[in-house]
């Protein structure tokens, strides 16, 4: 009979907050009512806590849980990634009876069809979608689970500061050449002023309370609309000119993008309770600096609603 080494006492009797597995990839099929199924190859990170009295977790049980849950998905007509995370949490507590906390993070690439803005050429767009669940178990074995879903989308931003500097420089040069104030205004209203651009990465995570639904497609659309412009895999010349011009007509700081996402989240998800947790993050990959720009807000919908009144 094999000795259960994991169940023995450790040399150093200190509890650990998270022990588990990372970088576990699995193919899953999410069935949708009256729609084509979604095929994903997500990465899983799965953790439980470990008491000070136990040497280790039973590591093989965590990937075993994921396999069992994925197999059970075949029998479900409609299944969301947040529900998948919740089922994994419940199963983790069954397999790791010593655990009082469990956590699951799932993220992967989600493929969508897109059209170029002018020529309407079709291509594939890739976004990152995410699901996170955290469960706690009390002394009476009551389990409380919080779940979140979200997405990460790439877009383009145009810097307002550099654009304003070049606008002032253009005004000065036009005045030196004898143009009137009215002519200068007409000229500047007719052309796009140059600036430097960034590849923006917007992220939104929203809690999904019991009895409510949060559409990931809505989150993706909010992120897209909150930057200076969208990016596309396939652009012909007329499309490229349009994308660049429109982005320069809509310059945004990294802070502007984050605040616009917040405004749109509050408007779109007005049916969710005030205590719903929200995370909004914007990272802009700078083109003329070696660093990146960052803005974030972690809050509840109630707090955000009060600020936007």
Swiss-Prot record:
GO biological process assignments: tetrahydromethanopterin biosynthetic process
InterPro entries for the chain: GTP_cyclohydrolase_FolE2/MptA, GTP_cyclohydrolase_MptA
GO terms for MF: GTP cyclohydrolase I activity; GTP cyclohydrolase IV activity; iron ion binding
Co-factor remark: Binds 1 Fe(2+) ion per subunit.
Pfam families: GCHY-1
Record keyword Phosphoprotein present: no
Top enzyme category: hydrolase
Annotated site location: May be catalytically important: 159
Keyword terms: Hydrolase, Iron, Metal-binding
Catalyzed reactions per annotation: GTP + H2O = 7,8-dihydroneopterin 2',3'-cyclic phosphate + formate + diphosphate + H(+)
Pathway(s): Cofactor biosynthesis; 5,6,7,8-tetrahydromethanopterin biosynthesis
Essential cofactor(s): Fe(2+)
EC number(s) recorded for this UniProt protein: 3.5.4.39
Domain of life of the organism encoding this protein: Archaea
Complex formation: Homodimer.
UniProt similarity note: Belongs to the GTP cyclohydrolase IV family.
Function recorded in the entry: Converts GTP to 7,8-dihydro-D-neopterin 2',3'-cyclic phosphate, the first intermediate in the biosynthesis of coenzyme methanopterin.
Record's protein name: GTP cyclohydrolase MptA
Natural source organism: Methanococcus aeolicus (strain ATCC BAA-1280 / DSM 17508 / OCM 812 / Nankai-3)
